[in-house]
Amino acid sequence: NTRLVGSEMCIRDRDGAGLANIKFDVSPGTRYISRFRSVKSQPIKNIFQHVNQRFENLYASDPAKLKDVDYLKANEAFTGELYLGHLRYGTFGKNSKENCHPFLRQNNWMTRNLVVAGNFNLTNVDELFDLLVNIGQHPKEVSDTITVIEKIGHFLDQENNRLFKEYNEKGYNNKEISSLIAKNMDIPSILKNASMDWDGGYTMAGLIGHGDAFVLRDPNGIRPAFWYEDDEVLVVTSERPVIQTAFNVKWENVNELKPGHALIVKKDFELKEVEINSPSNLQKCSFERIYFSRGTDKDIYKERLMLGSLVTPQVLEAVNFDLKRTVFSFIPNTAEMSYYGMIKATEDYLSGVKKKKIQELEQN
């Protein structure tokens, strides 16, 4: 029952990449959060080489241990149940390893640990930074991701404090309280309070140390999010074709996360899609759909064909309708579908020209 949440590791290298993993139910004194980030020229390849090297070394020294799940979980990194991967396309801050997601907020209490990665661009980072300062925090830098993780972390701490006080007053001891907090944490409330002042497009994925996870989408649906669940896994990505290819499922089996909603995944695999912020006017990001997303998505494919068709009149005017001396091509590769739409519309235009000339001949 491995859960994959927010797995955003596609084959297109950008400014860096990162991978985090959380193990369930490990003994105190055992590391349960693993993370590795890379800004190498091929960051994804570098990440998998780093992770796989551990198992290659183990295979060389003691192959039998590769089949010992208990040993692996107790001794090797990246052998947990919960994963969060991210590909960085930098639009804010420096392109350094420290700016690569996932970001980690650590604490000795399991339920206060937070791992966050996202596809987002907030327009009011300075305002959010000031809000953190006004509540007494001292953020180490002005960046959108640090601001987001500290904002979520602040309300995660408050939820921990609330539950601790509640169960302490009921007479539970500290060890019992830790388990009760993990079981009864109100994640929707945390996300609602944390995102109240966010302005912009975002899909935020987060893992909490004890095993809960969430993915939150902005109310306008600016940033995309899709999810799929079966008997073995739950996976969330920014692009539908990734899920279709990796899990060999049909388009209709992949769900779109509703704007303003969060997918909440409890450690016991209970799954809920909850409204966090009231959905507003749908404003899907044109950059995502026209340029960045895979053209193999059914909707994206149709939109790009239509885009090519719609720009054709302007293209024809720009070349003064002199198609004999016009060469059609496309840049970059993601414009290929739009190119086919433009060619189809141009062929339709030429068919109209031929029809008109035939009609003129008949009249003469």
Question: For the regions a protein language model found, what residue spans apply to each?
Answer:
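Conserved short alpha-helical segments that host acidic/polar catalytic motifs at enzyme active sites
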Residues: 1-3, 7-258, 264-327, 331-332, ...
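C-terminal substrate/ligand-recognition segments
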Residues: 335
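Short, glycine/charge-rich flexible loops or terminal/linker lids adjacent to PRPP-binding catalytic cores
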Residues: 344-364
